[in-house]
UniProtKB/Swiss-Prot annotation:
It comes from Burkholderia cenocepacia (strain ATCC BAA-245 / DSM 16553 / LMG 16656 / NCTC 13227 / J2315 / CF5610) (Burkholderia cepacia (strain J2315)). It comes from the Bacteria. PROSITE patterns: HTH_LYSR (PS50931). The gene is cysB. Induction: Negatively controlled by both CysB and SsuR. GO terms for molecular function: DNA-binding transcription factor activity; transcription cis-regulatory region binding. Residues 1-59 form the HTH lysR-type domain. Pfam families: HTH_1 (PF00126), LysR_substrate (PF03466). Belongs to the LysR transcriptional regulatory family. Residues 19-38 bind DNA. This is HTH-type transcriptional regulator CysB.
Amino acid sequence: MNLHQFRFVREAVRQNFNLTEAAKALYTSQPGVSKAIIELEDELGVEIFTRHGKRVRSLTEPGRIILASVERILQEVESLKRVGKDYAAQDQGNLTIAATHTQARYSLPAAIAEFKKRFPKVHLSILQGSPTQVAEMVIHDQADLAIATEAISDYKELVSLPCFQWHHAAVVPADHPLLERKPVTLDDLAQYPLITYDDAFAGRKKINHAFALRGLSPDIVLEAIDADVIKTYVELGLGVGIMADIAFNPERDRGLRLIPVGHLFGSNVTRVALKQGAYLRSYVYTLVELLSPTLNRKLIEQALKGEAESYEL
């Protein structure tokens, strides 16, 4: 048995049991993948996959147990590689961050700027996606950490820690009647067409829930995945924007005004997610600490080992 066989098993599952796609992902041949998996099954004395003819269909019951072991072994192998790299070069390497647009655009820049001052030789990559997508990037080892508000705390494969709180705000043109309402109510907002986030982003469920509790059905004329799009269409007069307050910049958004509405929708928590049991290079801890001063290396290490008590802001 060898690591290549383990990788073939894992990739077959990731590719929805399509061995041709698994072979492409691992830059090898489909017959080679099929043969290696059969040899592993023969050595273990059990079938890992159910088959219909020559086609792999699903995991068998022992296959599920084997997959869990394979995942752990391959993660440990990656951790060993990182340990070696860490000690060979403490202040250089690669760091990939997966983040939603709002976090990449508004939360990360200050932390990244300070990080690059401290670690100029570390190559940074930022991948953007939905909360679900960035979580899966970490799970599948495509990113070292994920930053988002939703979804990332829902995966058992991840450890998520709170970074900071933020609230929703209404954004309107400088002469909008809502600026005269203090405080703004849900009934006030419901009088206007609304522009806000897609259902998968930035606390949209809280917005929907608040209106539903009030018995209101707001006219949401446009949904977007980032705040810049929301602000653009507010400027065009299409409606009132509801977005994260951290995405408003008075200097850049001079034609708009921000109205706090946190009292209507409650607070939201941006979280950083790391893979359960992962080995992190020292500079990853530094970046997490820059994102949230309330976090430190000891707390992060305890959380990764499952030793930390539930920690919230």
